[in-house]
């Protein structure tokens, strides 16, 4: 029996297109109906979050934010370390090529004149000499094992002993607050008599010209002082100094260091140590000098708006005559009082997470602003707040934070303002530089005239670096 042929599934194009249109329209109608259906639920389970009735909700949220911040810092540090490793590999390749070239020249010189062999070898050693400050692997292991104050003090002493010139970086908004006389005494008491100390006032774009001139005049009574604008300026900065741009100040500092190195006729390269409080811009100064000396070179030191970005010694070679050493920021508190801790948090030298009472830090900031006329009013204008009626410091701080909490929606159950959340807003804006502030230098009188250095010494040091251009 002959088998029947199977029926063909072939259809006309007209029928096939009509079926496709019907199917698409049906899917579109179903999708529209699903959107209108109030019983529609996502397949992904939604996190209900922390209930408002939970008593420790603020602490848990703070811990979550802190963990996020730590992860971001670790990510930035890993990225920066990768860039540094790449830069170091490039330097090693350049050094290898240079050493090969030197060896070839030495062979040619020896063949032409054998008597000059010893002199040439000495010059070659001087070109390649680099003071070994610290073994990076052993230092990282020691820091992981012990990150206490003693460990950082030990590294600070290494920087001072190994450096010929010390650049003490200060914040232009409060140079006296970011200055430690203990550091100056340790530098002057070091074994090397030829060691020089220079004040570098960084972040000058955040203060008016009149205030900057006062601070430069005041600090030059102690040590040679240089105003510096290491970065191109923050987005919140609206204070411009036409005579002190970033390129001009960096170029002048680089010329001064090279001039001092040429006058001293050092056999090895000049080692410049950069020290200062956390978050004053030490790494930014080094990155600016590197970028200026080597056109377009990537930044070798990680820099950021968070205190403690630099955790180990970092040596950067500019050329055969100049080396820079970046050091971790070390805090030298004057006392163990709460006010001194609040002052360090205000300077962003210590993280605000180290303080249990952010309201006290915000109150300290308000007290600081009230000392300089007009600064407290400018901060009220920034937050668009009306003038406060209370006269006492405690009442003023409380009313200020209550207004901030209401304006930013930081309210708890029953509409009660969350003062801690409002204080954290103020502290974060302060650290980010969104609030303008600066301190005024004190007048030198008989009480503090004993701390002033010898005028002749300061003048001689300034001449050695040709600092008359600043």
Swiss-Prot record:
Description of the deletion phenotype: 20-40% of cells exhibit morphogenetic aberrations represented by irregular, uneven, or overdeposition of septum material as well as septation and cell separation defects, often resulting in pseudofilamentous or multiseptated cells, suggesting a failure of cytokinesis in those cells. Cultures of null mutant cells did not appear to exhibit a growth arrest.
SUPFAM superfamilies assigned to the protein according to its UniProt record, in alphabetical order: P-loop containing nucleoside triphosphate hydrolases
InterPro entries given in the database record: G_CP_dom, Gnl3_N_dom, GTP-bd, GTP-bd_ortho_bundle_sf, P-loop_NTPase, TRAFAC_YlqF/YawG_RiboMat
Record keywords, A-Z: GTP-binding, Nucleotide-binding, Nucleus, Protein transport, Ribosome biogenesis, RNA-binding, rRNA processing, Transport
Domain called CP-type G: residue spans: 153-333
Basic residues compositional bias, start-end: 1-16
Family matches, as CDD domains: Nucleostemin_like
Compositional bias of kind Basic and acidic residues: 17-27
Subcellular location: Nucleus, Nucleolus
Location of the region described as Disordered in the Swiss-Prot/TrEMBL record: 1-56
One MF term in the entry's GO annotations: GTP binding
Comment, domains: In contrast to other GTP-binding proteins, this family is characterized by a circular permutation of the GTPase motifs described by a G4-G1-G3 pattern.
Family per record: Belongs to the TRAFAC class YlqF/YawG GTPase family.
Function: Required for optimal growth. Required for normal processing of ribosomal pre-rRNA. Required for nuclear export of ribosomal protein rpl2501.
Protein name: GTPase grn1
Gene source species: Schizosaccharomyces pombe (strain 972 / ATCC 24843)
Origin organism lineage: Eukaryota, Fungi, Dikarya, Ascomycota, Taphrinomycotina
């Amino acid at each position: 029996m002959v088998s029947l042929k199977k029926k063909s599934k072939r259809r006309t194009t007209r029928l096939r297109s009509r079926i496709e249109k019907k199917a698409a329209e049906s899917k579109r109608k179903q999708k529209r109906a699903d959107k209108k259906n109030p019983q529609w639920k996502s397949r992904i389970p939604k996190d209900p979050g922390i209930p408002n009735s939970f008593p420790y909700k603020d602490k848990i949220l703070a811990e979550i934010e802190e963990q996020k911040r730590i992860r971001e810092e670790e990510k930035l540090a890993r990225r920066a370390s990768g860039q540094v490793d790449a830069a170091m590999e490039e330097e090693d390749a350049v050094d290898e090529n240079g050493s090969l070239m030197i060896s070839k020249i030495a062979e040619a010189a020896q063949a032409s004149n054998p008597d000059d062999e010893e002199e040439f070898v000495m010059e070659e050693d001087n070109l390649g000499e680099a003071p070994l400050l610290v073994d990076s692997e052993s230092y990282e292991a020691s820091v992981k094992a012990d990150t206490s104050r003693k460990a950082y003090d030990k590294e600070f002493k290494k920087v001072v002993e190994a450096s010929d010139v010390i650049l003490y970086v200060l914040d232009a908004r409060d140079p006296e607050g970011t200055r430690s006389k203990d550091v100056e005494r340790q530098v002057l008491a070091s074994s090397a008599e030829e060691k020089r100390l220079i004040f570098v006032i960084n972040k000058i774009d955040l203060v008016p010209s009149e205030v900057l001139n006062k601070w430069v005049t005041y600090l030059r009574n102690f040590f040679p002082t240089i105003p510096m604008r290491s970065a191109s300026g923050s987005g919140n900065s609206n204070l411009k100094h036409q005579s002190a741009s970033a390129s001009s100040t960096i170029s002048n500092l680089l010329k001064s260091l090279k001039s001092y190195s040429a006058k001293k006729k050092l056999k090895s390269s000049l080692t410049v140590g950069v020290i200062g409080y956390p978050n004053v811009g030490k790494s930014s100064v080094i990155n600016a000098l590197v970028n200026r000396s080597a056109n377009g070179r990537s930044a070798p030191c990680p820099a950021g708006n968070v205190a403690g970005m630099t955790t180990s010694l970092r040596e950067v070679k500019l050329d055969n005559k100049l080396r820079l050493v970046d050091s971790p920021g070390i805090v030298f508190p004057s006392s163990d009082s709460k006010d001194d801790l609040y002052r360090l948090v205000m300077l962003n030298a210590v993280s605000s997470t180290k303080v249990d009472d952010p309201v006290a830090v915000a109150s300290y900031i308000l007290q600081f602003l009230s000392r300089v006329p007009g600064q407290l009013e400018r901060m009220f204008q920034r937050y668009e707040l009306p003038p406060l009626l209370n006269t006492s410091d405690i009442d003023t701080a409380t009313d200020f934070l209550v207004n901030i909490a209401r304006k930013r929606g930081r309210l708890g159950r029953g509409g009660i303002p969350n003062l801690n959340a409002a204080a954290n807003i103020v502290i974060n804006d302060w650290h980010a530089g969104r609030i303008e502030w600066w301190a005024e230098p004190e007048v030198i009188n008989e009480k503090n005239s004993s701390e002033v250095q010898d005028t002749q010494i300061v003048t001689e040091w300034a001449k050695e670096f040709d600092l008359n251009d600043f």
